[in-house]
C-alpha cells in the first residue's frame, strides 16, 4: 500500500516538478527535433536527391512505385509491429539519454563532446520525419502517414523529447 502511494505521489508531484525544473532542456530537445524536421521537409521538397540521401533510394522508390506507405505491411502482424516500434522507441530514448554523457566513435577514434550524440539523434530523427513528410505529401499520402503516427506518436515523441532533454542536461 505504501509503495503504491509513493508511486502515485511521484507521478502527481515529483514528475511534474522535475519537468518544470528541466523544461528548458526538454524544450531545446523538442526544438532541435522540429528544426531537423523543417530542414528535412524543406530540402526534400526542393530536391529529391536530398530525400534519397537521407531515407535511402530503396525506401523512396518503393513508396513511389507502390503508392503505399510501409504501414500496410504490418496488417495482420500488429502485435509484432507494435513490439518492434516499442523496442525502437525505447532504444532511441536510451541512446538520447546515454548520448548526453559521451559518445565513442571507433571509426575516428575520438570521444565527442558531451551531448553531441544526443544533438545528432534529435536532429537526424527530425530530419527523417521531415523527409518522409515531404515524400508522402508529394504522393498525396500525408493523411495515411499522420493517421499512423498520431495515435502512438503523441506518446512516443514527447517521451523521446524528455529523454533528449535528459541527455542534454547530463
What are these regions (language model features)?
Residues 75-117:
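Individual transmembrane alpha-helix segments
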